[in-house]
C-alpha cells in the first residue's frame, strides 16, 4: 500500500513557522513528508529539514519523496519526546522551527496490516512503531476490567467505558480477542441500542483510547513540547496540529505555562519565584482548516493548529 501524505493546513503551517532561507526546521512527525517537502521548497538551497518518526514505513516513504533534496535532509527513527537527543547526535545546537502533526496518519488507518481501524477487519495492533511496546491486542487480553475502563474513559471520553470493559473481559474468557472486527462487535454489543443510534461509530472512542494508550501519546506530549521549546532559537516558531480535545488541552496548557511561568500567589505585588517566560503565544485561539480543505479532506475536520514563538 502506497504511503500518501495529505498535509493538513499546509499554508497555515508554512506561514506559522515564519520560514526563512537557510533555516533549520524539524518535523517531529514527518510521515510521508508532505509538510516536510513544502518546508524544503520554501527555505532555499541552504535550508535543512530534520524529520523524526517512529514508524519505519513512514520514514521509508519520506526518504523516497525527499531524494531530490539530498544532504539537506536528515531522517531519524525516534519518538519525538527524544528531540533533544536526536539533535545532539546530529550535532545541531538549535533550530528555527518545529512542527508536530499529532495523531494517527491516514496510511496507518487505511492499511489493514497495521490494525488501527474498526472499519477494516485485521489483526489488532495499533503500534506506530510495530517493533516496540505492547500492542492493543495485548492490552485488551491482559488488563483488568478496571484498567481497561480507565483507559477508555480517560483517553476516549467514552460514557460507557465501564460497560465496554466488562464486556471485553467477559468475551476474552471464551477466546482471546485477536482482531479489530471482533473488538468492534464487542463494543457495539456493550453500548445500549439507543446510544448506538447517536453520533459516530460506537467503537470510535474506544479505538482512539486504546491507540493513545498503546503509543503513550498523551503521556509524552507535554514533555516533548517543553523539550522542543528548549532547542528553538530565539524567534523560532513551534506549530502543533491536534485532532481531539485531549491533545489540544495539553498543548494549550503547556504553552500557557511556558508563556506565564510565575507561580507566585496573586496577592504578591511582584514576582519572586524567578519563573522566566520562554515563549509568546502567537495564536490566541487555535487556527482551524477552511471549509474548502475539510470538503477535500474530511479527516482535517477536527484539526486545530496552535503556534508559539521562542523569546
Curated annotation (Swiss-Prot):
One of its GO terms (biological process) is rRNA base methylation. GO terms for cellular component: cytoplasm. Its main location: cytoplasm. It holds the Pfam family Methyltransf_5. Keywords: Cytoplasm, Methyltransferase, rRNA processing, S-adenosyl-L-methionine, Transferase. InterPro entries: RsmH (IPR002903), SAM-dep_MeTrfase_MraW_recog (IPR023397), SAM-dependent_MTases_sf (IPR029063). This is Ribosomal RNA small subunit methyltransferase H. It comes from Pelotomaculum thermopropionicum (strain DSM 13744 / JCM 10971 / SI).
Amino acid at each position: 500500500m502506497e504511503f500518501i501524505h495529505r498535509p493538513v493546513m499546509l499554508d497555515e503551517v508554512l506561514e506559522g513557522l515564519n520560514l526563512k532561507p537557510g533555516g533549520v526546521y524539524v518535523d517531529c512527525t514527518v510521515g510521508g513528508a508532505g509538510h516536510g517537502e513544502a518546508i524544503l521548497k520554501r527555505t532555499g538551497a541552504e535550508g535543512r529539514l530534520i524529520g523524526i518518526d517512529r514508524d519505519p514505513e513512514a520514514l521509508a516513504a519520506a526518504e523516497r519523496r525527499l531524494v531530490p533534496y539530498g544532504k539537506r535532509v536528515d531522517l531519524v527513527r525516534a519518538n519525538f519526546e527524544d528531540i533533544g537527543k536526536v539533535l545532539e547526535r546530529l550535532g545541531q545546537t538549535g533550530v528555527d522551527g518545529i512542527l508536530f502533526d499529532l495523531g494517527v496518519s491516514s496510511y496507518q488507518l487505511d492499511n489493514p496490516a497495521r490494525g488501527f481501524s474498526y472499519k477494516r477487519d485485521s489483526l489488532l495492533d495499533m503500534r506506530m512503531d510495530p517493533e516496540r511496546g505492547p500492542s492493543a491486542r495485548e492490552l485488551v487480553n491482559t488488563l483488568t476490567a478496571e484498567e481497561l475502563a480507565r483507559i477508555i474513559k480517560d483517553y476516549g471520553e467514552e460514557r460507557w467505558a465501564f460497560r465496554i470493559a466488562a464486556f471485553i473481559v467477559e468475551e476474552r474468557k471464551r477466546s482471546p480477542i485477536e482482531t479489530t472486527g471482533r473488538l468492534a462487535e464487542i463494543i457495539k454489543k456493550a453500548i445500549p441500542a439507543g446510544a448506538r443510534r447517536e453520533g459516530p461509530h460506537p467503537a470510535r472512542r474506544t479505538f482512539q483510547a486504546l491507540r493513545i494508550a498503546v503509543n503513550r501519546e498523551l503521556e509524552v506530549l507535554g514533555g516533548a513540547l517543553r523539550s522542543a521549546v528548549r532547542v528553538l532559537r530565539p524567534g523560532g516558531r513551534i506549530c502543533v496540529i491536534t485532532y481531539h480535545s485531549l491533545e489540544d488541552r495539553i498543548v494549550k496548557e503547556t504553552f500557557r505555562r511556558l508563556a506565564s511561568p510565575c507561580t507566585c500567589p496573586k496577592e504578591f505585588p511582584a514576582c519572586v519565584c524567578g519563573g522566566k517566560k520562554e515563549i509568546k503565544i502567537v495564536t490566541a485561539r487555535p487556527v482551524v482548516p477552511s471549509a474548502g480543505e475539510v470538503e477535500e479532506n474530511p479527516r482535517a475536520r477536527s484539526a486545530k493548529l496552535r503556534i508559539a514563538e521562542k523569546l
